[in-house]
Amino acid sequence: MNTSQDTIYAQAYENISDFQFDEKVAGVFNDMIRRSVPGYGQIINTLGDFANQYVTTDSNIYDLGCSLGAATLSIRRHIDNRNCKIIAVDNSESMIQRCRENLSAYVSETPVDLVCGDIRDIKIENASMVVLNFTMQFLAPKDRDSLLSNIYKGLRPGGILVLSEKLNFEDESIQSLLVDLHLDFKRANGYSELEISQKRSSLEHVMKPDTLEQHGARLKKQGFKHFNVWFQCFNFASMVAIK
C-alpha cells in the first residue's frame, strides 16, 4: 500500500477547511491512520481472524467505508473456498481508485465488488460479517440508528458486526487523560504541535464520536443481544456485536 508520509498539516494555514477524504488524503492515508490511530494494525489483522471464524459459505461480507482496502484484504486472506463475495464501499472516488489498485496486487478467488457510494444507501443482504472501521463517527448522529438497523436486518443469524470507533467518555477526568495519551502517541509518531492542532480543527465539525454507552444502547435497540469491546487503546476501541 501507499507509504507516502502525511505532511498535509505541516504548514500553517490561515483558514482550516473541514477534513475530507480527497486525493490528498488518499495519497497518504496509510501513513496517516497508522500514526494517528493506536492499535490500527492489530485491528486490521484481527478482522481476518473474525472472518475465519464467522464468515459462512455462500454469504456476503460488507466493508463499509473501505478506504484503501486494508480490512477487505485482511478478510479476504482468510475466507478462500467459501464461495463468498465482499462488497467494499466508500464515498471517495480517490479512495476507491487506490483500493482497486491495492486489491489487484493480491490474487484471490474471493471476488470484491467496489462501490463508490454512500454507505447509507447500501442494502445489506445475506451478510455473515459487516465491518465499520472508523466510519460511523463521520456520519451525522441522526443517521446512525438507521444504518445499524439496515445492518442488523441484513445479517444472517450468528453473523457479526465489527465496529471500530474513536470514543468520548462521560467522565471528564478519563476523557482528559485518554485524549492526552493519544496526543502523546501522535507526538511520538512524529506529528508536530502545528499538525496536531490543525488536524483537530479540520475534524471538529465532521467527526462526532460517541461514548461506549451510546454505542451499546444503539446496538441493543436494533436487536443485537451480544455486544462487547474486544480491543481498546486510549480513546479508540473496536467492538463486536453478534446477531
From Swiss-Prot:
What job does the chain carry out?
A: Catalyzes the conversion of S-adenosyl-L-methionine (SAM) to carboxy-S-adenosyl-L-methionine (Cx-SAM).
Q: Which GO terms describe its biological process?
A: tRNA wobble uridine modification
Protein name stated in the entry: Carboxy-S-adenosyl-L-methionine synthase
Q: Which amino acids does the record list as binding S-adenosyl-L-methionine?
A: 40, 65-67, 90-91, 118-119, 133, 200
InterPro entries annotated for this entry? CmoA (IPR005271), Methyltransf_25 (IPR041698), SAM-dependent_MTases_sf (IPR029063)
Q: Which SUPFAM superfamilies does the record match to this protein?
A: S-adenosyl-L-methionine-dependent methyltransferases
Family matches, as PANTHER family: CARBOXY-S-ADENOSYL-L-METHIONINE SYNTHASE, TRANS-ACONITATE 2-METHYLTRANSFERASE-RELATED
Family as reported in the entry's similarity comment: Belongs to the class I-like SAM-binding methyltransferase superfamily. Cx-SAM synthase family.
Which keywords appear in this protein's UniProt record, sorted alphabetically?
S-adenosyl-L-methionine, Transferase
The protein's annotated catalytic reaction(s) are: prephenate + S-adenosyl-L-methionine = carboxy-S-adenosyl-L-methionine + 3-phenylpyruvate + H2O
UniProt keyword DNA damage present: no
Q: What's the gene? A: cmoA
Q: Name one GO molecular function term.
A: carboxyl- or carbamoyltransferase activity
Q: How does it assemble?
A: Homodimer.
The record's annotation in Gene3D superfamilies points to: Vaccinia Virus protein VP39
User: Which classification does the entry list for the species?
Assistant: Bacteria, Pseudomonadati, Pseudomonadota, Gammaproteobacteria, Alteromonadales
Broad class of enzyme this protein falls into: transferase
Write down a Pfam family by its short name. Answer: Methyltransf_25
Would the keyword Transferase be found if you checked this record's keyword annotation? yes
> What EC identifiers does the entry list?
2.1.3.-
